[in-house]
Amino acid sequence: MRSLKLILASASVVSATCPYMSGEMPNSQNGPLDRRHDTLSDPTDQFLSKFYIDDEQSVLTTDVGGPIEDQHSLKAGNRGPTLLEDFIFRQKIQHFDHERVPERAVHARGAGAHGVFTSYNNWSNITAASFLNAAGKQTPVFVRFSTVAGSRGSVDSARDIHGFATRLYTDEGNFDIVGNNVPVFFIQDAIQFPDLIHAVKPQPDSEIPQAATAHDTAWDFFSQQPSSLHALFWAMSGHGIPRSMRHVDGWGVHTFRLVTDEGNSTLVKFRWKTLQGRAGLVWEEAQALGGKNPDFHRQDLWDAIESGRYPEWELGFQLVNEADQSKFDFDLLDPTKIIPEELVPFTPIGKMVLNRNPKNYFAETEQIMFQPGHVVRGIDFTDDPLLQGRLYSYLDTQLNRHGGPNFEQLPINRPRIPFHNNNRDGAGQMFIPLNTAAYTPNSMSNGFPQQANRTHNRGFFTAPGRMVNGPLVRELSPSFNDVWSQPRLFYNSLTVFEKQFLVNAMRFENSHVRSETVRKNVIIQLNRVDNDLARRVALAIGVEPPSPDPTFYHNKTTVPIGTFGTNLLRLDGLKIALLTRDDGSFTIAEQLRAAFNSANNKVDIVLVGSSLDPQRGVNMTYSGADGSIFDAVIVVGGLLTSASTQYPRGRPLRIITDAYAYGKPVGAVGDGSNEALRDVLMAAGGDASNGLDQPGVYISNDVSEAYVRSVLDGLTAYRFLNRFPLDR
């Protein structure tokens, strides 16, 4: 018998004053480029490293530790049948057959990251939540961004509401803010959630379309359930197709309660405000990205964190006294309504920085389970009927995904503090409880684990002032009835170009609706929001334009609410393409790269050429480049126009032409610049009759600091909307 030297592989263990009081914003302190050694990540690494398996210098083994000496199955002779006794084969194949777990019913497509939340101040005057009880106090977090309707394999750039779920691993337990990138939802009562999802998911007969609402059942539901209009307007705007997950806000959607140690309660809405600035894609660009890079959003987030350009968000609270909740012309318990910011400004509470990518997608991003019922002392619920249903649904669905009740024991789901209770057994139990008296009250274990209360061991408590009374009814409050005024508020608050984008989105979606009845019903609902909007959509989808239905018309606006028309706050991780020729243009390109890096080293400079050439710095080929994946495009030394087998015909011109058509900054440096950009304008349908001096177009004969600064200013402006036509 051959002997093996047995090596057992074991798991390695790796081991302030509120700035607003002085009128200063906190500075962003980016750590070193290697995020794995960032000190802010230490609490996360220290906890999760207990579960790491390091295969370095190890021997391949079975799941039970037996060394494996060969990768062939056991056979009776070298051409004979495989034997059933081959336990190595059986174990490997069986594990593979069961690797996949059911995907989330919604929010299946997602990406996540670890980080840290820092409180700006001691907020114990408004909440007993311990993670907010000291200025500078830090709490580990994990955030998962997602789309809603698509399956796990769908594209990132699909038009959709986007999930923004945050877990804070506080020193008194886990607190989840399970929100979206828009502040409202489609329905007011959780009992309709299955109806909504059945309607927006692919048609049940054909399983078409994937990750899209451009079909009959979705718009049938929207037109029959007008509470969906407000969220629908947000989804049809730039919020439905964001530039990246770094450029979205996160909203808690519901009204919650904050409760102090003394029992005083305040109503609150949560918002994570992006400190990168909000930014959206345009629809043709989003469609192109779906084919060119289906992982565009998750790659953007991953790359930003890997390069040390940590995205940041500021947590804000809208605070309303309990006694004032009836002073608004809408109900604070209605999840289809916002509190306009001019009525209740946000109080800045703290800052979140995402600074560490997952080490294993499945173990962390896929297995994390968020639950609105994960609250801590100082946070309480309201009677929002959608929230009350989510408290059940988000917990129940985990039984299907994880096959038992012990999903909270998974490393990514565990609190960072000890936990003790009488829950026992179940599939996948990971602990060995020592207490034989698994019940309360008991004397056999001296009453342990003992109950906490409001004054002893800081037990969770409900706001003392909460009371419930009234007859049992199946109805919504009449204060929920007006579902048209706030969609109009949203529409009124968009810029003229953003309104055009929304109109175009509704035209596109409804052009795919086959039922004339559904299309007519859609126009009826849109007309209750805005007659001009309804007429513009109707004319494009074969429906007679309606007369005004002014019951809910008004001229109110709120703060800038869209994703275009405001400057970006940071340029971190944006990409500028330098289109090179196979000649002396590389010298100019390298000068440009150096100048951009000197002016702002947070922007990525990508040299595009016919073939990869590390010595010249060419890190992308024309065959792999596209105008959708860059934020600005500059031609260096004239356009490459010759035919080549290395890229599709006309690709260099197409890259910059598409970038121009998407409203992005474009430019040219060196010989042939004017000719190149004139070709671009002609190909894109632009107007070059008045010269090339127009917003977002940058021309120079040589590299200069002024030229580089002008392009960076164009990136800050983000998109040049004058290139997009408006309805006359």
UniProtKB/Swiss-Prot annotation:
It catalyses: 2 H2O2 = O2 + 2 H2O. Heme binds at residue 394. The active site is at residues 107, 180. InterPro entries: Catalase, Catalase_AS, Catalase_clade2, Catalase_clade2_helical, Catalase_core, Catalase_immune_responsive, Catalase_large_C, Catalase_sf. One of its GO terms (biological process) is hydrogen peroxide catabolic process. Keywords: Heme, Hydrogen peroxide, Iron, Metal-binding, Oxidoreductase, Peroxidase, Secreted. Its EC number is 1.11.1.6. GO terms for molecular function: catalase activity; heme binding; metal ion binding. GO terms for cellular component: cytosol; extracellular region. Its cofactor is heme. It is found in: Secreted. Pfam families: Catalase, Catalase-rel, Catalase_C. The keyword DNA repair does not apply. SMART domains: Catalase. Occurs in almost all aerobically respiring organisms and serves to protect cells from the toxic effects of hydrogen peroxide. Belongs to the catalase family. This is Catalase B. It comes from Ajellomyces capsulatus (Darling's disease fungus).
